[in-house]
């Protein structure tokens, strides 16, 4: 559960002290991978890296997901909420199978008294699902090939969700700690392109065999804000309000909300993990990634069971908050049909 929505820069929590650098935007529309063609007789350790390369486009061979939410051990109500809407089409050819996929994966961690957090998180998820489903529907109706929404469209959707919650606060005359709000982390998948948007401290991680576990999002909290201003991390997180949110959806109008939006290409088998802070607190995922995250990238791993085990792990070592996880597993292979020899 996120802190008091009325004063987003006061209070404390239990988060890891670390600097997070979001992954840079990319402009590719098709994932590619590079293969170096080397003559074994010419390979040497001091050889310059100027060998010819073949750039292979990649396409999805499979996309699946699993999700679960849990109230935790100390909360009476679950203020987390998530939503998944995915359309996956199998394509079979003599050269091998592939899939075309569009998916919207949303996780929100609500806050606010008198059931406000539960209402806010659900409002945000449903508003965003409807917005992006309508966006893709309009593309199909105009006979356009559905593409990943551009950053301005994603921002429009996030601000719409903020406005819906803000208007509810105003209509119900909610004040102080009763004012409802929510964090947001969202992944939008269109084949091998992924857009990530977030507000608050709910996170998205990416796991690959090459790079291991990477935190893609950067928490919107006082400590991270101070680090971006040049303050040393150890000083930034010595503040009593270091873990307090600097923005959330709902408590304030759109002038105070600026979602972070990034684009990525899937060019190798990848696992995406969306998580509320009940799962990410105390470096839990970083500490246990080898046993609880890494195995899930295998096609043989049961994602539903893996998510249940992540929830159990969080209850064992955290348990102080609601816990929610969404896992997305993307498998890719080279698109050899696009290669001309």
Show which residues each predicted segment covers.
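PP2C/PPM-type serine/threonine phosphatase catalytic domain
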Residues: 1-341
